[in-house]
Swiss-Prot record:
Dihydroxyacetone phosphate binds at residues 213, 253-255, 274-277. It comes from the Bacteria. This is Fructose-bisphosphate aldolase. Its EC number is 4.1.2.13. Binds 2 Zn(2+) ions per subunit. One is catalytic and the other provides a structural contribution. GO terms for biological process: glycolytic process. GO terms for cellular component: cytosol. It comes from Streptomyces coelicolor (strain ATCC BAA-471 / A3(2) / M145). D-glyceraldehyde 3-phosphate binds at residue 53. Disulfide bonds: none annotated. It catalyses: beta-D-fructose 1,6-bisphosphate = D-glyceraldehyde 3-phosphate + dihydroxyacetone phosphate. It holds the Pfam family F_bP_aldolase.
Length: 343
């Protein structure tokens, strides 16, 4: 299927909220990990989101130049072509972008889509993330207002993170403490600045104890029920009916989450869940297994010539793709998006 148009992307998000499921947002760093994500979505019969972080884009730009925009645009254009061969609909997104990288990443990418839209085409990416969690909320929302206005004109959705997610993601790090919980006051200030859709659609990465990276169960206290409090607080203040879900929430830092925590988040308006750490492991684990099992073929040991079939990147690359795709299928099951593809 083609990459989602702006209209289809909005439909995807509306369907997720109404159906109480969420789309896995899979970080990719190469054409191979892109295919793994697309394959996983197709096998699960789930639509989904593929995203590129600043670090991923830099890697894609090549180690000689490390140009983030070049890397992101190149993989996005590639995705627009290869996605046609998969019977699911996928949206393209850029992940965490802090203030010091806006001018080298998100702003130029919005400009690319602005030019495409002026020419009567669809935007290259369907959404971009502004991560202002390291800034004061006032500065965060001020920049978000500027980006939201540009995104709306380019038919793009903006994702904002208003309070910190713990751990580290591509150089953006926060301590694990009480600041990891968004308050109703934070939500009110967000709506005052960004509106409730009339200024452009945005996704909200609210914090309810989330932590990026790897952690053991019990080390982090997630409170997904907090999302209900945020929705209720805004619905009450703005005269919306009881049970309204004014926000499109994003779940960051979900590695190690329990099924119950994920279910509670879905019930309260989460429509997108970022997955990176787990799929990185799922991609790499089969490669390690292959290398250990074929050590004397992969390396030229004791004067031998090795075995080309074992060190051919396609041999172990196929295993990596299959491993990551299987983890994407698992994620679709956890998030209830499996079998929910747009017909």
């Amino acid at each position: 299927m083609p990459i989602a148009t702006p209209e289809v992307y909005n439909e995807m998000l509306d369907r997720a909220k109404a159906g109480k499921f969420a789309y896995p947002a899979i970080n990719v760093t190469s054409s191979q990990t892109l295919h793994a994500a697309l394959r996983g979505f197709a096998e699960a019969e789930s639509d989904g989101i593929v995203q590129i972080s600043t670090g991923g884009a830099e890697f894609l730009g090549g180690q000689h130049n490390k140009d983030m925009v070049t890397g992101a645009v190149a993989l996005a254009e590639f995705a627009h072509i290869v996605a046609e061969k998969y019977d699911v609909t996928v949206a393209l997104h850029t992940d965490h972008c802090p203030k010091d990288k806006l001018d080298g990443y998100v702003r130029p990418l919005i400009a690319v889509s602005e030019e495409r839209v002026k020419a009567g085409r669809n935007p290259l990416f369907q959404s971009h993330m502004w991560d202002g969690s390291a800034e004061t909320l006032a500065d965060n929302l001020s920049i978000a207002q500027e980006l939201l206005a540009r995104a709306r004109a380019a038919r793009i959705i903006l994702e904002v993170e208003i309070t910190p997610t713990g751990g580290e993601e591509d150089g953006v790090s926060h301590e694990i403490n009480d600041s990891l919980y968004t308050t109703v006051d934070d939500a009110v200030r967000t709506v005052e600045a960004l509106g409730l859709g009339e200024k452009g659609r945005y996704l909200l990465a609210a914090s309810f104890g989330n932590v990026h990276g790897v952690y053991k169960p019990g080390n982090v206290v997630l409170r997904p029920e907090l999302l209900k409090e945020l929705n209720e607080g805004i619905a009450s203040k703005y005269g919306q009916p009881a049970g309204s879900k004014p926000f499109d929430f994003v779940f960051h830092g979900g590695s190690g989450s329990t099924a119950e925590e994920i279910a509670t988040a879905l019930e309260n308006g989460v429509v997108k869940m970022n997955i990176d750490t787990d799929t990185q492991y799922a991609f790499t684990r089969p490669v390690v297994d292959h290398m250990f099992r074929n050590y004397d073929g992969v390396l030229k040991v004791d004067g031998e010539v090795g075995n080309k079939k074992t060190y051919d990147p396609r041999t172990w690359g196929k295993l990596a793709e299959a491993g990551m795709a299987a983890r994407v299928v698992e994620a679709c099951g956890h998030l209830r998006s499996a079998g929910q593809k747009i017909k």
